[in-house]
Amino acid sequence: MASTLPPLGGGNGGPHTQHSLPSLPAHLQSDTHITGHLASRFHVSHPTAKLSSHALVCLNTYTSSSKGPDGGKPGSAMAGAEDMADRAWIRLGHRSENQAVVFLGESGSGKSTIRSHLLTALLDKSSTPLSNKLSLAAYVFDSLTTTKTATTPTASKSGLFYELQYDTSATTNPILIGGKLLDHRLERSRIADVPTGERNFHVLYYLLAGTSQAEKTHLGLDDGASGSRRWKYLGHPTQLKVGINDSEGFQLFKTALKKLEFPRSDIAEICQILAAILHIGQLEFESTNNTSATGDDSGGFSHEGGQTSTTVRNKDVLGIIAAFLGVSMADLQSTLGYKTKMIQKERVTVMLDPAGARAHANELARTLYSLLVAWILESVNQRICAPEEDIANTISIVDFPGFAQQTATGSTLDQLLNNAATEAIYNFTLYNFFDRKAEMLESEEVSVAPTSYFDNSDAVKGLLKPGNGLLSILDDQTRRNKTDMQFLESLRKRFEGKNPAIEVGSATAKLPGSNFYTENAAASFTVRHFAGEVEYPVKGLIEENGEVVSVDLLNMFNSTKSEFVGRLFGQDVLQTVNHPIEKSTVMQATISSKPMRAPSVMSRKGGRGRGIASQRRQQESNLFDSGNTHAESRSPKGGNKGGIDQGASGQFLSSLDNVQKAVTDPGTNAYFVFCLKPNDRRIANQFDSKCVRTQVQTFGIAEISQRLRSADFSLFLPFGEFLGMADAETILVGSERERAEMVIEEKRWPSNEVQIGSTGVFLSERCWMEIAGLVDGSAAQGRFALPSSDGYGNDGATPGERDAFGASKEQLLSGGNTPLMYGEKGKPGYFGSDDARSEAGASAIGGGDMFKNFDTREQMAERGNEKNLEEIEEFKDSPSRKRWVFTVYFLTWFIPDFLIRWIGRMPRKDVRMAWREKLAINMLIWFMCLVAAFFIVVFPMLICPKQNVFSAAELSSHNGKDGNSAYVSIRGHVIDLGSFADRHYPSFVSRKTMLNYAGMDVSSLFPVQVSALCQGTDGSVDQTVTLDYKNTNMTGSPALINSQDLNAQYHDFRYFTNDTRPDWYLEQLIMLKGNYGKGTIGYSPEYIAKLGAKRQVIASIGSRVYDLTTYTVGGRRLRTKPGESLPSDPKLADFMDRKVVELFQNQAGGDITKFWNSLALAPDVKARMQTCLDHLFYVGDVDTRNSTRCKFAEYLVLAVSILLVSVIAFKFFAALQFGGKNVPENLDKFVMCQIPAYTEDEDSLRRAIDSAARMRYDDKRKLLVIICDGMIIGQGNDRPTPRIVLDILGVSETVDPEPLSFESLGEGLKQHNMGKVYSGLYEVQGHIVPFLVIVKVGKPSEVARPGNRGKRDSQMILMRFLNRVHYNLAMSPLELEMYHQIRNIIGVNPTFYEFMLQIDADTVVAPDSATRMVSAFLDDTRLIAVCGETALTNAKSSFITMIQVYEYYISHNLSKAFESLFGSVTCLPGCFSMYRIRAAETGKPLFVSREVVDSYATIRVDTLHMKNLLHLGEDRYLTTLLLKYHSKYKTKYLFSAHAWTIAPDSWKVFLSQRRRWINSTVHNLIELIPMAQLCGFCCFSMRFVVFIDLLSTVVQPVTIAYIVYLIVLVATKTTVVPITAFILLGAIYGLQAIIFILRRKWEMVGWMILYVMAVPVFSFGLPLYAFWHMDDFNWGTTRVVAGEKGKKVVISDEGKFDPSSIPRKKWEEYQAELWETQTSRDDSRSEISGISYGTKAQAVVSEYGFPSRPDSTTGFAAHALPYDSRNNSRMSLAHSDMGHHRMSQFGGSQFFNPDDMVGLPSDDALLAEIRDILKTADLMTVTKKGIKQELERRFDVPLDAKRAYINSGK
């Protein structure tokens, strides 16, 4: 029948000219020979071959893909792609079939390049503006999803299904009407994890390289010189310069978006998001202590300085990101610092460490990029996609990333899904060649010789089978929250021994050196893919498959101020699950791994008759879920109940199924392109036979070629159609079949290309084209030229456009230098040359700055920081507040508000007001400090100014011997001889000679010329007058040297000498006083009087002393030069006025100032006399240092010291409380022990809980109440704190009570909180203690730190509960459940509890502490609260803790003991204090009284004072309230009760803790001082204590200044007084030492030394730091603004709280309802509906029931349950018979339901059996446990419920 025509593509030029592989002879059809044939073609520049008409085999030449053997296009890969496009086009037009082109090949084989050539060729067929857009859309897709890898510069990292949509109904020339881009599974992991030597997605590099300088500045990309900043998300800096023209790429990217009709603003927003992603990579995190106090602070002593939190180090980068994303910096930082997860239906917040925060930031970057890509592609599709009903046919291009032997980015999931897709595509390829026509051939009775081939069905079924394939199992296990190991076990069950392609590894392994199996950390499964075996580790696979987007991020972006970011997060691609009750609350979200649209091939199955819009919507949704068992909600807000329906694998599977269905659709004709790499090293023109042979083998090209040799059928034509085409009307005889046979005989086609069936003819494509008259591509192109209309009503495309796309086939962008896979430049197929020319230069938009009309970054940031606020309450300021505000403004008026706003960066008015208040308080404190300093230092100096005088004894002590300085006096002036000696001229007088005069009066060495120094009575004195200088030579006067001293002659320049220099003396004296003066000689008033009595003419005027003795007793003489005669007038020597001389003589020895002032002398005479006195008779100054005034000043300093020490002495005596530590007898009072827990670790919590449980106090009368503040996983913990607590207490994870509402302390809606209640018995070291655990879980809408409201709120839960119990008020659901648990489960009426012990979760209490405290309460009924001594457990962990040890010791044993004397300890530490709940005699509530509870529950904390009270020192404030409202009661310190806590060990936390303490001290003491009733006898009262405390706190810095001042005094003066002061200060520590010596605390000696070294820190540094940081708070979002008529309005972004949203009932009403319900129902165990706040009811009494019971606690209340719970008169376990019976033995370890007793043996039967057992048992070895086990064996039932009876031995 068939002849032997020349085969397809034959030729005569040697073997390499044969381009069709099936046409090779049979002996050349092996892998090796085909590889050889490809090699021979490759070497002559023929890089392609064909598999008949079905497939193209392309070898990557790594040079140009458009050059053939002759340098032209023919023979090139490009020509091959165009040929395929021509044939697809012809079939599309002539047969109206859908066409699909499927690409296969490894990464680096050139798929993307061939794909672009093919797309270009197809779009060239209809050169319209739309084809331009479709080309640009492909470029945008590639920019976003391709990257450079180790194997290729353009590796696609997302599966592409690109659909070109045509209308073929009107003509054989199809009209292009649209396109659709479907991306499958972008490799998101690459964003934050760029493999070494590879790049991230190209668009990120484009952005960095292509933006102008102005744009870079706006985007924050311009740091430093170019290239100096290393971008974490861009890999190694070398990747920025790898020969890809990124700058040009960016211009093209923008151009493409612009031509795709993206608004300019959207393009700019896209760039901002990309920049934000780059910046997210730059964030650096550090672990810090958040020292700003907030209302929801929680935790114990060690946390008080601030919670450990993770913050961003580079805030500038954070600011840029926050601005672009439209959120506030604070929100962004805190959101990155924690992560909310779902753990077993519980929402838990994990406090992240820096590494965790970095991972969270990476997740943000991945989420943003994924959403951005999804949004851009969906926007592109909206612009290019035609309505489904208009589409007649499509051409689809399918190109998925190549097979991956190992993962580059570390994502196993990406690798698995990628390989599953290549497996599916390869399977379809095999199906197409081997099985697709098999059924039809069979039905047409055509037999074809079978061909063997490698079938990958096992792998495909194993991976992709819906329901129980590997991906489906992975999805199912993810949905059911299974672990990786459970997933592995599921795979084992499914595949072991059932599927040869999948091998499951072991879940356990033996570690080296161990004999035991442990969990295998490297557990994996292996899949035998068609391209090789791949081992996939399971670790982290389930979590990765969940791909859950952090709810925290969603929550943050809900309030974004950026409209664009809002659009990104509002897409359908982001699938959310909403809370079943609170619909607005998102519980979980994922980004879909499948495209948001489906292939049109499938969409059209719905029919064409309906309306366009509705039909399309219906089709989209039907299709979207095609192959998907769970219908997926596409509404972003809608969501479903049970969690996300599909994980990544399920979604990918579903989308892959859509692709397969589209390609295998009967109406679709598929072509294949096999891309091969000639070598692995990317070397041009090198052919590695081994490398190529492996690929030929992998893809089964030889088998396919053999198959085509026997059956190359592409079409089936019924006889009629075939004959019509063949123009066979001329053949008139025979049936249709016979006529067809005749035509075929005539055509002489080979038998493998044509076969006749029973109803028609099977043809190859070549034969069809021949018979249809479409012999080659050129004919096709020539024959089917475009018609005049382009289908859009235009007159066809302009010639220019058509030419452009004609030109665009090869090298489009002459300026480009982007190497593609084939080593060519440019972007093939995307841009016309016109586009390139017009817009490749400067930035396409906005003349170099696309952000020209945008908000600046600062404006964006400001917008992001704004909150949406609403009014929540109104109030008026109190008069005292108004007075204080006036004072503040009075003190700070000089600082204008705008300065605080701009320089202090405080936009909020309330924050600025707090700053003013802080400044005012600091000014007052500084003023008090200055007053104190003035009083200590300046005041004494004002009373007794400092005198530089030397007594005779002091002068003589400066004699230059024994290291003393050498001073001399000259006429009353003291000169430093030691300093002057070396400068004495002439130099022949030795220093030693000079120092002989030290300590003496050397006035005699300096004779004076009287006429030069005194002008006498009448204005002149005769030159011959001389005056001797004589000392009195008494013990009080300086020792005068002899006037005959030999050295005197050298200084004698008087008139009668040869060398007369009248002014020499005065000049020398001025020089010596100026340079070497030390002071003057001092004469005390007593000594002057003594001299006067001894006939000395000496007196003082003012402070100066004058001695006229020598003048009066003849010391005046007249002396002339030799040869001159003496003047005759003897009165020449009387140069002083007589009245002056007489005054001195008459008043000698006294102060004559008054007389001098009233002396009757002419003013000029008096002035001359004063000069004479000063120069000739002055001998020194009056020494007042021992006067009463100066003594007072000295002793004032001493008095202050004595005052300080007296207070300490008081404290010392207070501390000397000896007396034996008598251990009190057993007490029968009921005590609650409250432990608030926050983020402590398990060790701390266990220590605290165990120490409380092990206290030596009747276990039945203790109740541990542990309150967990929020569902939070602390740093370093592996579980949330509540779970740690419940695990310690032995509560099973299966116990899950209902969360119940209660009121909390919070802003706005945060006042509504929810909590869970657990109770049971805790067994530890022989103690069995009842416990109640309250877990604050928050409302479902709380995303961040759910339930967390702070330590004060935790205290309030119990305080408010007890308050409502004692006042019989209506309670919230949580409180009713607490009441029920305490009363009906634990069996004690809550009113019985008298005392509450509060300890912190990091505190350990001594075993006898509760007993000692309770006995103190019993001894003194006026005692309301008591605290014990707290020491440190971590004393030696750092220097910071070491300096605190002694301070803790003395603060308790001195300060608190001192305050305790007055019955007013002003600070009871929350870490270890006990309170009296109600008065012993009257039952009146004390600790939980209405006033205390209401004041402590203040929610509006908006002033500096309130914040310091309630946010800094809530413990101290609680004490303040007790003293304020119960002033007749006392608070005491009990030194015999001990606890140990953890102190801050880092400087920052220590600083913060002390800041809190100091400031809260100041503010609390200010609260206490105004209380009138606090004054007592002689002020020895509480107010005295408070005032002393406040004063000492405020002036602490001055005390240090005082000590420093004393040290300086001692150093400068050796007088006795400062030394006395030091002795006193030493006594302070001496007294302290006595205390610890008497207490035998010898180790305190060392700690004391450390403490003394740190005193400057404690007393000076810390207070000053604290006072200035008084306003360092986290101010929250609630703020106060001025309202009308003096009112203030509180506004908040938390929303307004409605108290009625929490239902409240009294216990009696609730119990009556409960009782009614229980009595009206059947005996069967039915559930109560309608009134239960709590868990399901199971027991007769308990409406809340036992699911909330742990499984390992005693039968504490087992027998009490049937008891009428209304009979509350005998509920005390101590005195009720029932209680006694129940408590007689703490056997048993469970709570039992009476219904559990059904089917158990009776007590009598048990007793009989026990007796029987004991008859034969060895009584020495028998145990209760053994007897119980034997009974269980005999009765064959578990007897846990009867354990108490068995153990009782009755």
From Swiss-Prot:
Topological category with respect to the lipid bilayer: Multi-pass membrane protein
Region annotation (Disordered) ranges: 1-27, 289-309, 593-647
Domain DEK-C: 1800-1850
InterPro entries, per database record: Chitin_synth, Cyt_B5-like_heme/steroid-bd, Cyt_B5-like_heme/steroid_sf, DEK_C, Kinesin_motor_dom_sf, Myosin_head_motor_dom-like, MYSc_Myo17, Nucleotide-diphossugar_trans
EC nos: 2.4.1.16
Source superkingdom: Eukaryota
One GO location term (cellular component): plasma membrane
Regions crossing the membrane: 884-904, 923-943, 1196-1216, 1568-1588, 1590-1610, 1617-1637, 1644-1664
Keyword tags: Actin-binding, ATP-binding, Cell membrane, Glycoprotein, Glycosyltransferase, Membrane, Motor protein, Myosin, Nucleotide-binding, Transferase, Transmembrane, Transmembrane helix, Virulence
Biased segments, Polar residues type: 620-630
Sequence similarity: In the N-terminal section; belongs to the TRAFAC class myosin-kinesin ATPase superfamily. Myosin family. In the C-terminal section; belongs to the chitin synthase family. Class V subfamily.
Role of this protein: Polymerizes chitin, a structural polymer of the cell wall and septum, by transferring the sugar moiety of UDP-GlcNAc to the non-reducing end of the growing chitin polymer. Contributes to the production of conidia and the ability of fungal conidia to germinate. Involved in the fungal cell wall integrity and the ability of conidia to withstand biophysical pressure. Required for appressorium formation and evasion of insect cellular and/or humoral defenses, promoting the fungal dimorphic transition to the production of hyphal bodies that occurs within hosts, and ultimately to virulence.
Name listed for the protein in its UniProt record: Chitin synthase V
Organism: Metarhizium acridum (strain CQMa 102)
Gene name tied to this protein: ChsV
